[in-house]
Amino acid sequence: MNFFFIFLFFLTINFSLSTKVISKESWLLDKNLSSIEFELPVLFANNVQGKFEEINGIIEIDLANKENNKAIFSVKINSINMNYKKYKNLLLSDIFFNSYNFPVALVDTKKFSYKNENEFSLEVELTIKGKTEIVPLDIEIIHLANELIQIKTDLDFSRTLFNIGTGKWKSTAILKDKGVIKTNLFLFKQE
């Protein structure tokens, strides 16, 4: 009789551990297919546009109750390619992104609810230059295959809120305040 209870105990432990492992799935960013770009409007000139070459990201989906989902994406600031190449050093300097002291910018969803929608919005934490602000993020999810999804997002941010542009560059008369970050992300399900 004791043996039966011990066996049942270990069987229950094993089942609960395997359920916890199965109840979460991870999706990893394909860095070669994905892109994260930004744009800052400029009065009477071409907008400042850039693309980050070094990006990372992961999404964890809570399959059990769909409430504790998490996603985090980051860019290495000095990996930017931009249309105003002669101003790249200025953009990386302490006047704008200060990439020496703040080499990474990131978006963190914390916990969010997801119930297989194709489009939805979240409030996320955007961290630039060591400053974190809550901003809205519009998300479109395209299921390409069982193990591959595409995520497109639009995120508006205030450059002055993050001190992007100091001194004579703080003015929003020429270089406007509202910036946009657009992503086209491809993620593969982790086995």
Where are the language model's segments positioned?
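Low-complexity, acidic/polar, glycine-enriched regions of mature
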Residues: 17-191
